[in-house]
Amino acid sequence: MTAMWLAPLIALLASFLTSVALAADNPLRIELVTEATSIQPGKPFYVALHLQHSVGYHTYWKMPGIVGVPTDMKWKLPQGWKADAIEWPAPERVFMFQIKAQGFRDEKLLPIKITPPKNLQPGAMKLEGRASWMCCGRDCNPGFKDLSIELPVSSEATPPGIRWSKMFAENFADIARECGDWTIHATRKSGTIVLRIKPATERAKLHLREIEDVTFFTGDGLIDPNKPESLSRTGVEIVLTQTISEFAPKPLPRQVAGILQTPQGWLPDGKPKSIRISTPLRD
């Protein structure tokens, strides 16, 4: 009797240990996916790098901070095809060991717009490229992988596939955009950048008191994400002070560009969580 239940238990344990070993050896699973079910000549569509991180691991945003390397895709497309840059979702705070950086955990799509030529002929098209990344957790793992996806060419549009449509929609919603409900002024002061965030509409004014936490993700390396932030507030504005990075571009940019993020959201409905800013830097 004991042997009857012990054998499957041992098999289950072996399977579990194998999966743990695989997760340790391969902390990132990456594939090329699309919600498109066909390609129409001359009509742009989206593919995406689908990232699945093992628990405790992360990859990096387009501007990682003072450590890390952003995920990239080098395409090998036929003549007449065009691949745009990655449309980056808003990042989150991650850690390379004890160093704060900007990146992604868990599951994420990195969308890329593809434009086929107008004279595309019927048949099947295979799109190929080589992905590169740095995945870090308790260790760091640089990686490269050849990826491809094949779709039929159709003269008429076909419905998007069910498998990826929801996740594409969620990731597009997570791409930070400008928000006219707020004005941001940036000044340089003794090795720091001071952002003054003021409501510009009545709904933003009503929501100001609800905002408790704000994080800035630098888009160009001007700010050091690993240095402490100072957040203060008055009845009319939020003031965020950050340290200029010793690795900042020289001469310093005349704009402060990046993502402002708050878990309370920037408007009364709790959305958006992230907004894109690009504002002049004044002395």
Report the location of each language-model feature.
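Bacterial N-terminal signal peptides
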Residues: M4-S19
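Extracellular/lumen-exposed scaffold segments
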Residues: A21-D283
